[in-house]
């Protein structure tokens, strides 16, 4: 799927209440479905995890073990985090319910299925709620792809805090755990672009009991097991808690120290980034007299474990209560996830901080099985839109040292690590094997690829261009300035130009009219107006018009955001940072001839 987390900074995507009356069987009578419509809907939706008391009754459940709350609509698809964790918990024998996009003026939606026996899990959704609501220029967004009809306003600002307060009001004394991208990247003191301030750990502001950071399969399963057996919840890998002590932990600069010296945020962020990769020692950060104590990461799943998760009985559909389509589902409906993790380590990218740099790939057999399921679904037209992940052509890649004693910030920058074993030829054969399955007419790559890696295998590149580019290929050079690319930890721009030349040559060889869609960024820390003019000149020299240009958004937790906040590079050297909206808008406008960017009417052609 090409919904990369760093899509926020490479190509990314009215506070009002979304009432459940808009869903045809939701009742305002204490959250219980009533009448024939409710019964029919409950019967129809038994293949989904329950969202109402009527659906619980249809399963013969008197109570839930675990309640999961999400800022996204409920889509029973493995690309959506809360439903995936719900299916995993269900497989392990727990009774799980989901509340999707609850109203935040009352705890009624939260409480409609009753108090869960073990805990409530909360996620703001697939995006940080502030990023979901506001553009790079702090303007309100008018859409939300994770909501029926794509309508904005179905989740609150700072959703984890709001939902946690609702749970406390609905169920006093309930164990509350936060997860998902918002909680994961705000687990320690962080800069918040939307308030232009340093904020404390989300764990303190939300008053939750625990944060599960990163991919949460291990953490949430172990938490359920321990609460069931009455064991302490301390020491679970991949979790964050509040502690009176920091025993055995690596101490980060405190919240108060960062307030005094902004450069301390860079120090803390780089230590957190290294710990996410090395995964051997806990971290602790003082906030006043308390410590936010971060256990080592849970680690990447193995192939068999990953296969088992994606083979859970997902319907791959939105919950039947929704009357309108959910745009995010349409984007991934006919795609399959083949790989997790990304070795790129770009300084602005959230993936390495959430999924880690360690790569894990699914087996060909598991992917074949999932594609066979796609071919049996209503609406199937023969096209697998994507077989990928954060970086499609890193499927099957692995580290010869398994990441042990690795001090690199990236597996691919400044050049490809000699310990990284690429298997792009095997990936190409995987794609070909999928096209031979009954009912499959075509397989495409909707994810982005690393062009620097692709250049290392001419046969892969030839097969990619000749067979698996669906008209457009997404690449992320991000900029052309060597200095800016160094700050981004991105590949030399000359490699991008080499790739475009080979791509054009191979398109001619195969008689195909295909396009490269380059993703570029403005207003990155260290980027000047002159740098943007150079980039705009390059586009004009090729006869291209930028389609996917994103103004840098300082999302919590990344090295680039710390550079923005501190106005220095990762080594502490002062750099220019475009901070005012005017400066940022001016840089972005350079790509469009000094005008505000509109929807491009032409495509970049090779």
Language-model features and meaning:
Residues 460, 525-540:
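Catalytic cores of alpha/beta
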Residues 37-63, 73, 266-336:
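N-terminal [4Fe-4S]-dependent radical SAM core
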Residues 68, 84, 103-104, 373-517, ...:
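Conserved SAM/AdoMet-binding glycine-rich loop
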Residues 18, 69-74, 89, 322-350, ...:
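N-terminal pre-triad scaffold of radical SAM enzymes
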Residues 128-137, 185-187, 217-222, 246-247, ...:
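Flexible glycine/acidic-rich beta-alpha junction loops that bind and position SAM and/or redox cofactors
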